[in-house]
Each structure stands twice: as C-alpha cells, then as structure tokens.
C-alpha cells in the first residue's frame, strides 16, 4: 500500500464539474493498493496517518497530529501510485491490485479513519476526477507499507 499524504488548507475533488468531496484544513490522501495488501495493512496505514505528527505547534515544530488540530481527510483512490517505471518509457501497473478487491480495501481504509472520529470525504473509485487543493507548506509524505 502506498499513500501520498499532503497537508492542505483546503481540497476538493470534482467529477464532470460537480464537487463530490470537499474539506478544509487537513490532509489530502492519494491511496494506492498493491497486490497482496490485506486488511491488517489498511488498518496500520490508517492508524499511522491518524497519529502522524505533521502539523505545527505554537512554536512552529511538527508536533501535532491530524486529530490534535481537528483536521479533515479527503481520500482518493489512485492505482497509478503503484506504477513500475524501471523498464522502458511506459509505466506498468501490474503491481496495482485490481477491482473489486482494491475498491473494498480502499473503502475499508476510509472506514478505519471514520471509526477514529475523522470527517472523511472521498472521490469516486475508478472515476476520472479533477482534484483542487492548496498545499500547506508544502508538506508531503509518501507512506509505503
């Protein structure tokens, strides 16, 4: 599993000109599920993101978690994160888990975050989406599990 975590002031995802998910201060998550991923990996990723101290305290140090700042989450499934670019010029996506299992695990991931009392907005699995966001920092982390 690979999750790109971007600290944002606000973010939204649109499909065909319609906003389907929108948040204020929090994190934008681009989520890639790979072959072999199972529920324990999803739970670990959600827990790690919930506790990761990526927000600044009053002294400007990154000591606060998403929960500490009351942040929101925008989660978007993105199989292209699992691209293999080692050979040739065309990325290979053979490592990306195929639906319906990948959709199920992405939904489980979002449910884990919601169960931890986060407000979670999402894109639509498999849809062509337009994402708008304002990075805060920028502060971006790639979580590989």
From Swiss-Prot:
Pfam families: Tyr_Deacylase. GO terms for cellular component: cytoplasm. It is an enzyme of class 3 (hydrolase). Its EC number is 3.1.1.96. It comes from the Bacteria. It catalyses: glycyl-tRNA(Ala) + H2O = tRNA(Ala) + glycine + H(+); a D-aminoacyl-tRNA + H2O = a tRNA + a D-alpha-amino acid + H(+). GO terms for molecular function: D-tyrosyl-tRNA(Tyr) deacylase activity; Gly-tRNA(Ala) deacylase activity; Ser(Gly)-tRNA(Ala) hydrolase activity; tRNA binding. One of its GO terms (biological process) is D-amino acid catabolic process. InterPro entries: Daa-tRNA_deacyls_DTD, DTD-like_sf. Its main location: cytoplasm. Keywords: Cytoplasm, Hydrolase, RNA-binding, tRNA-binding. A motif (Gly-cisPro motif, important for rejection of L-amino acids) lies at residues 137-138. It is found in: Cytoplasm. An aminoacyl-tRNA editing enzyme that deacylates mischarged D-aminoacyl-tRNAs. Also deacylates mischarged glycyl-tRNA(Ala), protecting cells against glycine mischarging by AlaRS. Acts via tRNA-based rather than protein-based catalysis; rejects L-amino acids rather than detecting D-amino acids in the active site. By recycling D-aminoacyl-tRNA to D-amino acids and free tRNA molecules, this enzyme counteracts the toxicity associated with the formation of D-aminoacyl-tRNA entities in vivo and helps enforce protein L-homochirality. Homodimer. A Gly-cisPro motif from one monomer fits into the active site of the other monomer to allow specific chiral rejection of L-amino acids. Belongs to the DTD family. This is D-aminoacyl-tRNA deacylase. It comes from Lactobacillus helveticus (strain DPC 4571). The gene is dtd.
């Amino acid at each position: 599993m690979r999750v790109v975590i971007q600290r944002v002031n606000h973010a939204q995802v649109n499909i065909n000109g319609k906003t389907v998910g929108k948040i204020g201060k929090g994190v934008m998550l681009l989520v890639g599920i790979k072959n072999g991923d199972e529920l324990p990996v999803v739970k670990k990723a959600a827990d790690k993101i919930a506790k990761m101290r990526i927000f600044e305290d009053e002294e400007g140090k990154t000591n606060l978690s998403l929960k500490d700042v009351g942040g929101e989450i925008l989660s978007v499934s993105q199989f292209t994160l699992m691209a293999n670019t080692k050979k040739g010029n065309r990325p290979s996506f053979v490592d990306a888990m195929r639906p319906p299992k990948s959709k199920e695990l992405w939904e489980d991931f979002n449910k884990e975050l919601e169960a931890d009392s986060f407000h979670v907005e999402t894109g639509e699995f498999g849809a062509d989406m337009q994402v708008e966001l304002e990075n805060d920092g920028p502060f971006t982390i790639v979580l590989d599990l």
